[in-house]
Amino acid sequence: DSSLVDGFSVANFLKHNQPEFYKVLTETNVTFKFTDIDTILVDEAKLIELDHNNNFRQIRFSGRLDYVPLLEENNLDLFYKARKYMFKLCNSDDFKIKFRLSKGMIAMFDNLRLLHGRTKFDPNTGFRHLQGCYIDHDVTEGKLRRLLKP
């Protein structure tokens, strides 16, 4: 089964109910790193990214890919508490929908707003195939600007 978590709603909840957590998650850069045989991807960004008007822009969360930020001890404690609480919210049914994709179905979603997850899978019970395709926002926004230009 698959699940989607609304990162915008999680961020908004934090902003209004845990402003100290929201502040540290929107101000602390975290290093994300993925390595395989062909690739080394590294990015430094905030778990909750805001735009220049302090509006929600993106959520990032990967317990396997993010590295400990270099912070003073008291700030690090706050960051970890905030990260743990955000993880709890992301796993809460209050912000998550669950669904099952059948053969031939496709799920399309905004990867900047939504977090995607899958339940554990026992390969002895069947077969699961997931194929991802990603479109960068700047590509689609650029195409939209071109189409709207007189």
Sequence positions of predicted segments:
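Active-site environment of non-heme Fe oxygenases that use a 2-His-1-carboxylate facial triad
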Residues: 1-150
